[in-house]
Regions:
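Polar helix-capping/helix-linker motif
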Residues: 10, 14-15, 58, 68-69
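Intrinsic-disorder/low-complexity peptide segments enriched for small residues
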Residues: 4-6, 60-63
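Short Cys/His-centered divalent metal-binding micro-motifs
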Residues: 40, 62-92
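Short linker/helix segments within small regulatory modules
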Residues: 47-62
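Intrinsic structural disorder/low-complexity segments
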Residues: 26-28, 47-48, 75-76, 81
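Short cysteine-rich loop/turn motifs with clustered Cys
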Residues: 16-44, 66-68
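A boundary/linker detector
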Residues: 1-21, 36-40, 83-109
Length: 109
């Protein structure tokens, strides 16, 4: 089975328990872990459910990432390729959040 087939299968089959957990997670964690936006959020599995099926409904396996405008879901969660995954997504999101929070702001004098 190819990686893209696994991804398609995991997306194509709706799971009522997953949808309930997803909604609860996004209600409790309503900001992107990387940029703090409240818009276009996704509950991302830290460990992919294709290989860690037992973690599909585990709340500790979720992190909130945005899909727009920065798309940290693709950038940090999947390293720019939805066939990939980032085992360091939690740590990477913290690093990016600090970088964004502490970035220098250009000011006109």
């Amino acid at each position: 089975v190819k990686a893209d087939e696994l991804l398609l299968a995991s997306i194509a089959v709706p799971n009522p328990k997953w949808e309930k957990l997803r909604r609860k997670h996004l209600k409790e964690h309503n900001r992107c872990a990387a940029c703090d936006t409240r818009r276009n959020l996704e509950a991302h599995h830290i460990r992919p459910t294709q290989w860690y099926k037992e973690l599909t409904l585990d709340p500790s396996n979720l992190i909130t990432l945005c899909t727009k405008p920065a798309n940290h879901h693709l950038f940090l969660g999947h390293l720019m390729d939805f066939k990939s995954w980032n085992p360091d997504v939690v740590e990477d999101a913290k690093v990016w959040r600090e970088k964004i929070k502490n970035r220098p702001i250009w000011r006109r004098f």
